[in-house]
Amino acid sequence: MPDGERHSRPPFPLLGGFALFIAVTAYLVIASMAKRSVPTFDPSPQVTASLDSAPRHDDTITVDATDSKRWQFVDFDRGGVVAPPDTVGWDVAVRRYHVIASDAIADLGVRRFEEVRDVPESEFVVNVVDDDTSNAAIRRWYKYSMVTHLLEPTGHAYAVRTRDARLAIVQILGYYCTGLRPGCLTLRYTYPFPVPGTAHRVAGNQ
C-alpha cells in the first residue's frame, strides 16, 4: 500500500472514539427528552387516636420518608402514620426507600392487588438488623430507570405480618412527593386480611 494512501485513513482508535462520542451524545439527548412522569403524592397526616379493635381498612397511606436518618412508622390498626413516642404497635417502618416490618414480610410477586387469595407461611422473611436494617422480601420493591433516573414500583404485592399475627396486604404505588421530590412512599393496603385455610385467618372472619 502506498505511503500516501496508508496515512490518508484515520486511525482506528480515533474512529472508535468518535463513535463512542456520538453514542453518548445520543443517549444524553434521549435522556433529556424522556418522559419524567410518575405518580406524586402529598404526605398523609399523622394519626393519634387509639383503637380498641381493628376495623377493616382498604386505603392508601403516603409516608413522608424524606429524612434519610429517621424511620417513619405506620400503624394499620390506626390507619395511618404515627410519631414517637406514640409508636407502640407499629406495623411498618419506612426510611427513604427502605421498608421493614415489626414482624415479617412475604413477597407475593407481581399480581393485581385484588387477586391475592393466599399467603404461604414459608415465604415470610424477618428483618436483618445491622447498620442498615432491611428486609430482603421487600428490598427490591422498585426498578430504577437509567434514562429518567427515577424509582418506579415493580407491581409486586406483599403480605405484612404484624406482631399480633394479623396480616396486611400491601402494594407500593409510588415514591415521589408533589414536585417530584423523592421520599413520599405511598402504600395501598387492606387490613386485617383474612386468609382462608391458614393459621393467619383473622378472628371474626372464620
Per-region residue spans from a language model:
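Surface-exposed, beta-sheet-biased, low-hydrophobicity segments with strongly acidic/polar composition
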Residues: 2-206
